[in-house]
C-alpha cells in the first residue's frame, strides 16, 4: 500500500441502509466520508442527524457529522471526486 501513503482518501459509501450507514460512520472516524443514497428524504434526515432505522446511535451520528466530516447526499456529482467507492446495496 505504499502508493497510498501520501494520499488522504475520500470515501463514498453508496447505500445507507443497515450495512452502509454504520460502515460510513466507522470510516468517518479516520477519513472524509460522503454517504450516497437515492432516497432524498433519508439523506435529508441523516444530514439532520436523524436515523429513523436506528442503525447508528443518535449521539454517534451527530458527532460524526459535526466533528468527523461525515456528510450525506443524493446527488451523484457530489461523490465524483472520491477516490474510494464502497457499495452496500441489496443484491
Question: Where on the chain are the PLM-derived regions?
Answer:
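Structural/interface elements that position substrates and couple domains in central-metabolism enzymes
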Residues: 1-91
